[in-house]
């Protein structure tokens, strides 16, 4: 257990990287790398797009984008369609951040600051979507539903949401690490590699889906109050 404790402390430690005399957290540097990678891939995939006689690459890209857009639009409705690009962008970032562990790089999502930032961005957009759909008065009125006595609970619910999103993502990613370390202690050869691949690939993608799905559900609830 001492080995597990030491490994956990090392994993939770925020490493700093010196860039031009500035100490920058490793998770931030890795996030920059992920964003640069996504920008380059986006440029490569979207260049030379055509209206007629499209290439197989463009056909596959359109199918993927249309499928994801239809999924979120079906969940949020037409009013929530404007927020689909954000959800897709966050999904791509979290997926890459979780999968980067396959290459021996510490995932940024193991840094509580990163998951907290993602949760805060999402919750700001969730509340904005509610204000945009209902108007300022309608949003304030929703805080008193179903009766004014519930106002403190409704405000508390808004405050709890980012904590829920943040800790769920951080906790699941960290939990996968703890499971891997326990497996290494029991079966140190061969088996850990298989479980590591599973946790890095499938569990990382599952956590991506859970985060954006919960964000979209909260957003739907916030928008749907006007109906």
Model segments located where?
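Selective transmembrane helix interface/packing segments
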Residues: 1-227
